[in-house]
Amino acid sequence: MPVWSWVAGWILAVAETTELLPEAKAGEGDLLAKILESNLINIAIILTLLFILGRKVVGEALAKRREGILEELRQAEQRKREAIERLAEEQQKLAQAQQEAERIRKQAEANAEARRQELLEQAEREVERLRANAEKELSSEQERVFQELRRQIVRQALSKVEQELPQHLNEEVHRSLIEKGIQMIAR
Protein backbone atom coordinates (compact mmCIF):
# COMPACT_ATOMS: atom_id res chain seq x y z
CA MET A 1 0.00 0.00 0.00
CA PRO A 2 2.75 2.48 0.59
CA VAL A 3 3.62 2.30 -3.11
CA TRP A 4 0.09 3.29 -4.13
CA SER A 5 0.09 6.20 -1.78
CA TRP A 6 3.39 7.35 -3.18
CA VAL A 7 2.07 7.02 -6.77
CA ALA A 8 -1.11 8.93 -5.89
CA GLY A 9 0.94 11.67 -4.27
CA TRP A 10 3.13 11.93 -7.29
CA ILE A 11 0.17 12.16 -9.67
CA LEU A 12 -1.36 14.96 -7.58
CA ALA A 13 1.94 16.81 -7.63
CA VAL A 14 2.07 16.56 -11.41
CA ALA A 15 -1.51 17.77 -11.70
CA GLU A 16 -0.80 20.78 -9.51
CA THR A 17 2.21 21.74 -11.59
CA THR A 18 0.09 21.85 -14.70
CA GLU A 19 -2.17 24.48 -13.12
CA LEU A 20 0.87 26.63 -12.42
CA LEU A 21 1.88 26.76 -16.04
CA PRO A 22 1.32 30.09 -17.64
CA GLU A 23 -1.47 30.04 -20.07
CA ALA A 24 -0.75 30.90 -23.62
CA LYS A 25 -3.19 32.51 -25.91
CA ALA A 26 -6.83 32.06 -25.26
CA GLY A 27 -8.02 28.64 -26.22
CA GLU A 28 -4.55 27.29 -26.77
CA GLY A 29 -3.67 27.28 -23.11
CA ASP A 30 -6.46 24.98 -22.21
CA LEU A 31 -5.51 22.57 -24.95
CA LEU A 32 -1.82 22.74 -24.18
CA ALA A 33 -2.49 22.33 -20.49
CA LYS A 34 -4.76 19.38 -21.09
CA ILE A 35 -2.19 17.70 -23.41
CA LEU A 36 0.58 18.37 -20.96
CA GLU A 37 -1.58 17.20 -18.08
CA SER A 38 -2.62 14.01 -19.85
CA ASN A 39 1.00 13.33 -20.94
CA LEU A 40 2.25 13.85 -17.42
CA ILE A 41 -0.45 11.57 -16.06
CA ASN A 42 0.40 8.95 -18.68
CA ILE A 43 4.11 9.25 -17.89
CA ALA A 44 3.35 8.97 -14.19
CA ILE A 45 1.23 5.87 -14.75
CA ILE A 46 3.86 4.28 -16.98
CA LEU A 47 6.65 5.11 -14.55
CA THR A 48 4.58 3.75 -11.68
CA LEU A 49 3.82 0.54 -13.55
CA LEU A 50 7.47 0.23 -14.56
CA PHE A 51 8.50 0.83 -10.98
CA ILE A 52 6.04 -1.70 -9.56
CA LEU A 53 6.52 -4.37 -12.20
CA GLY A 54 10.17 -3.64 -12.85
CA ARG A 55 11.00 -3.68 -9.19
CA LYS A 56 9.63 -7.19 -8.92
CA VAL A 57 11.39 -8.40 -12.11
CA VAL A 58 14.62 -6.58 -11.32
CA GLY A 59 14.40 -7.75 -7.71
CA GLU A 60 13.93 -11.34 -8.83
CA ALA A 61 16.76 -11.03 -11.36
CA LEU A 62 19.03 -9.50 -8.73
CA ALA A 63 18.03 -12.17 -6.21
CA LYS A 64 18.74 -14.89 -8.76
CA ARG A 65 22.03 -13.28 -9.65
CA ARG A 66 22.87 -12.94 -5.96
CA GLU A 67 22.05 -16.61 -5.38
CA GLY A 68 24.10 -17.53 -8.46
CA ILE A 69 27.06 -15.53 -7.20
CA LEU A 70 26.72 -17.04 -3.71
CA GLU A 71 26.55 -20.53 -5.22
CA GLU A 72 29.60 -19.80 -7.36
CA LEU A 73 31.41 -18.54 -4.25
CA ARG A 74 30.42 -21.69 -2.34
CA GLN A 75 31.62 -23.84 -5.23
CA ALA A 76 34.84 -21.84 -5.46
CA GLU A 77 35.39 -22.29 -1.71
CA GLN A 78 34.70 -26.01 -2.05
CA ARG A 79 37.12 -26.27 -4.99
CA LYS A 80 39.68 -24.31 -2.98
CA ARG A 81 39.31 -26.69 0.00
CA GLU A 82 39.55 -29.70 -2.31
CA ALA A 83 42.60 -28.21 -4.03
CA ILE A 84 44.23 -27.58 -0.64
CA GLU A 85 43.47 -31.17 0.40
CA ARG A 86 44.85 -32.52 -2.89
CA LEU A 87 47.91 -30.31 -2.53
CA ALA A 88 48.50 -31.65 0.99
CA GLU A 89 48.04 -35.23 -0.26
CA GLU A 90 50.40 -34.67 -3.18
CA GLN A 91 52.96 -33.02 -0.92
CA GLN A 92 52.74 -36.01 1.41
CA LYS A 93 53.13 -38.36 -1.56
CA LEU A 94 56.11 -36.31 -2.74
CA ALA A 95 57.71 -36.50 0.71
CA GLN A 96 57.13 -40.26 0.78
CA ALA A 97 58.56 -40.60 -2.72
CA GLN A 98 61.62 -38.59 -1.70
CA GLN A 99 62.09 -40.78 1.37
CA GLU A 100 61.72 -43.89 -0.77
CA ALA A 101 64.21 -42.50 -3.31
CA GLU A 102 66.68 -41.77 -0.48
CA ARG A 103 66.18 -45.29 0.91
CA ILE A 104 66.73 -46.80 -2.54
CA ARG A 105 69.83 -44.64 -3.07
CA LYS A 106 71.31 -45.74 0.28
CA GLN A 107 70.45 -49.36 -0.46
CA ALA A 108 72.08 -49.07 -3.89
CA GLU A 109 75.21 -47.57 -2.31
CA ALA A 110 75.31 -50.36 0.28
CA ASN A 111 74.80 -52.98 -2.45
CA ALA A 112 77.53 -51.39 -4.57
CA GLU A 113 79.94 -51.35 -1.62
CA ALA A 114 79.13 -54.98 -0.77
CA ARG A 115 79.64 -55.98 -4.41
CA ARG A 116 82.92 -54.05 -4.54
CA GLN A 117 84.13 -55.82 -1.39
CA GLU A 118 83.04 -59.17 -2.80
CA LEU A 119 84.89 -58.50 -6.06
CA LEU A 120 88.02 -57.42 -4.16
CA GLU A 121 87.93 -60.56 -2.02
CA GLN A 122 87.34 -62.70 -5.09
CA ALA A 123 90.25 -61.00 -6.87
CA GLU A 124 92.49 -61.56 -3.84
CA ARG A 125 91.51 -65.24 -3.75
CA GLU A 126 92.20 -65.53 -7.48
CA VAL A 127 95.60 -63.85 -7.10
CA GLU A 128 96.44 -66.17 -4.21
CA ARG A 129 95.30 -69.20 -6.23
CA LEU A 130 97.38 -68.09 -9.22
CA ARG A 131 100.37 -67.47 -6.95
CA ALA A 132 99.99 -70.92 -5.36
CA ASN A 133 99.64 -72.53 -8.81
CA ALA A 134 102.66 -70.62 -10.04
CA GLU A 135 104.69 -71.69 -7.02
CA LYS A 136 103.49 -75.27 -7.43
CA GLU A 137 104.30 -75.23 -11.13
CA LEU A 138 107.66 -73.62 -10.42
CA SER A 139 108.41 -76.20 -7.76
CA SER A 140 107.25 -78.97 -10.07
CA GLU A 141 109.33 -77.57 -12.90
CA GLN A 142 112.36 -77.25 -10.62
CA GLU A 143 111.88 -80.85 -9.51
CA ARG A 144 111.55 -81.95 -13.14
CA VAL A 145 114.68 -80.01 -14.07
CA PHE A 146 116.57 -81.48 -11.08
CA GLN A 147 115.44 -84.98 -12.04
CA GLU A 148 116.49 -84.38 -15.63
CA LEU A 149 119.84 -83.03 -14.48
CA ARG A 150 120.34 -86.06 -12.22
CA ARG A 151 119.50 -88.38 -15.08
CA GLN A 152 121.92 -86.59 -17.38
CA ILE A 153 124.61 -86.62 -14.71
CA VAL A 154 123.96 -90.31 -14.09
CA ARG A 155 124.03 -91.03 -17.83
CA GLN A 156 127.22 -89.09 -18.27
CA ALA A 157 128.74 -90.75 -15.24
CA LEU A 158 127.66 -94.18 -16.46
CA SER A 159 128.93 -93.42 -19.89
CA LYS A 160 132.28 -92.33 -18.50
CA VAL A 161 132.38 -95.31 -16.16
CA GLU A 162 131.56 -97.63 -19.04
CA GLN A 163 134.41 -96.15 -21.00
CA GLU A 164 136.92 -96.35 -18.17
CA LEU A 165 135.59 -99.40 -16.37
CA PRO A 166 136.84 -102.10 -18.69
CA GLN A 167 140.35 -100.86 -18.14
CA HIS A 168 140.10 -101.03 -14.31
CA LEU A 169 137.60 -103.84 -13.89
CA ASN A 170 138.45 -107.27 -12.68
CA GLU A 171 136.10 -109.96 -11.45
CA GLU A 172 136.14 -108.94 -7.82
CA VAL A 173 135.63 -105.23 -8.46
CA HIS A 174 132.89 -106.12 -10.90
CA ARG A 175 130.90 -107.99 -8.23
CA SER A 176 131.43 -105.31 -5.66
CA LEU A 177 130.09 -102.66 -8.04
CA ILE A 178 127.04 -104.74 -8.92
CA GLU A 179 126.19 -105.20 -5.26
CA LYS A 180 126.58 -101.52 -4.49
CA GLY A 181 124.39 -100.68 -7.49
CA ILE A 182 121.69 -103.07 -6.34
CA GLN A 183 121.81 -101.58 -2.85
CA MET A 184 121.48 -98.05 -4.23
CA ILE A 185 118.53 -99.05 -6.37
CA ALA A 186 116.89 -100.79 -3.45
CA ARG A 187 116.86 -97.63 -1.37
Swiss-Prot record:
Q: Does the keyword Membrane apply?
A: yes
- The regions listed as transmembrane in this protein's record are 32-52
In terms of Pfam families, this protein maps to:
ATP-synt_B
How does it sit in the bilayer? Single-pass membrane protein
> Does the record bear Acyltransferase in its keywords?
no
Where is this chain primarily localised?
membrane
Keywords, A to Z?
ATP synthesis, CF(0), Hydrogen ion transport, Ion transport, Membrane, Thylakoid, Transmembrane, Transmembrane helix, Transport
Cellular compartment(s): Cellular thylakoid membrane
Q: Which is a Gene Ontology cellular component entry for this protein?
A: plasma membrane-derived thylakoid membrane
GO MF terms here are: proton-transporting ATP synthase activity, rotational mechanism
Organism's domain of life? Bacteria
What is the similarity comment for this entry? Belongs to the ATPase B chain family.
Q: What does this protein do?
A: F(1)F(0) ATP synthase produces ATP from ADP in the presence of a proton or sodium gradient. F-type ATPases consist of two structural domains, F(1) containing the extramembraneous catalytic core and F(0) containing the membrane proton channel, linked together by a central stalk and a peripheral stalk. During catalysis, ATP synthesis in the catalytic domain of F(1) is coupled via a rotary mechanism of the central stalk subunits to proton translocation. Component of the F(0) channel, it forms part of the peripheral stalk, linking F(1) to F(0).
Q: How is the quaternary structure described?
A: F-type ATPases have 2 components, F(1) - the catalytic core - and F(0) - the membrane proton channel. F(1) has five subunits: alpha(3), beta(3), gamma(1), delta(1), epsilon(1). F(0) has four main subunits: a(1), b(1), b'(1) and c(10-14). The alpha and beta chains form an alternating ring which encloses part of the gamma chain. F(1) is attached to F(0) by a central stalk formed by the gamma and epsilon chains, while a peripheral stalk is formed by the delta, b and b' chains.
Q: What is this protein called?
A: ATP synthase subunit b
